[in-house]
């Protein structure tokens, strides 16, 4: 109702350790309760978890992309909306935060080089959630503006499938720097305190670890430093302040 969205993009489901979350019933109920009605729902069918679509307002991602045509970039004014991101609601009703295009691009591109030392062609991984500001900023927009590769990972530090998941991703994609929450490393440390999974992978391209989003306890920082043998940088943003 607040954003007056025209199109809703979703998937048939998502995967959590040990369970599948069916998205379509949740989305259907939200549409039913909303006063504002969307024009279209575009749904990505997860393999083995396909759901029925109700034409003509619901269409599959594959159908849309198979008929897509190349279009030119659209020029916009620097103060136009890039997106509206809704807060988690920890202080009441979720509030829509508006980011403008010009200032956001300048700030994010600056941080990629000057905070994270990421250059064009590097591989960067922000192990966050796109629904959070870190994910929006550092999975989607900042890598795009900087011209580097971004890793999008569906899974957890442990349980998908094991405590070596992060090391495998870093090794497979030659990740230069990782930005994640201390909770992720606490979970890995709890499951594999001796770092046995770590020894199975080649992390020779990995240069730095950045932690934020909550307090990073000294024991976890020291454990990560000793295991990774790279700088572990505990920096903070609005949640911590």
Stretches found by the model and what they are:
Residues 1-63, 182:
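Structural core segment of the AMP-binding/adenylate-forming
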Residues 15-21, 97-98, 187-190:
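Glycine/threonine-rich flexible loop motifs
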Residues 41-43, 54-86, 93, 103, ...:
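Conserved pre-ATP/AMP-binding loop-to-beta segment of ANL
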Residues 81, 87-90, 112, 124, ...:
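Conserved S/T- and glycine-rich ATP-binding loop of Class I adenylate-forming
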Residues 105-123, 133-177, 190-196:
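Conserved AMP-binding/adenylation subdomain of ANL enzymes
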Residues 129:
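Residue(s) in the substrate-gating loop at a strand-loop-helix junction
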Residues 148, 176-180, 189-241:
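Gly/Ser/Thr-rich phosphate-binding loop
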């Amino acid at each position: 109702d607040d954003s007056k969205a025209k199109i809703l993009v979703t998937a048939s489901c998502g995967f959590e350790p040990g369970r599948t979350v069916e998205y379509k019933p949740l989305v259907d109920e939200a549409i039913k309760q909303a006063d504002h009605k969307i024009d279209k729902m575009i749904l990505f069918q997860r393999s083995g978890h396909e759901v029925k679509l109700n034409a003509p307002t619901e269409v599959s991602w594959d159908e849309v992309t198979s008929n897509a045509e190349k279009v030119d970039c659209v020029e916009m004014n620097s103060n136009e909306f890039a997106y509206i991101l809704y807060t988690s609601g920890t202080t009441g009703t979720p509030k829509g935060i508006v980011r403008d295009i010009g200032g956001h691009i300048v700030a994010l591109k600056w941080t990629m080089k000057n905070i994270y030392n990421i250059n064009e062609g590097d591989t960067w991984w922000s192990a966050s959630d796109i629904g959070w500001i870190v994910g929006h900023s550092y999975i989607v927009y900042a890598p795009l503006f900087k011209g580097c590769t971004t890793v999008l990972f569906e899974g957890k530090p442990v349980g998908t499938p094991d405590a070596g998941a992060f090391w495998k991703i870093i090794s497979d994609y030659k990740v230069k720097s990782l930005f994640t929450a201390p909770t992720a490393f606490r979970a890995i440390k709890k499951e594999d305190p001796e770092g046995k999974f770590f020894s199975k992978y080649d992390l020779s391209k990995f240069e730095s670890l950045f932690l934020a989003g909550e307090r990073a306890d000294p024991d976890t920082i020291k454990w990560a430093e000793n295991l990774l043998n790279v700088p572990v940088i505990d920096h903070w943003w609005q949640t911590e302040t």
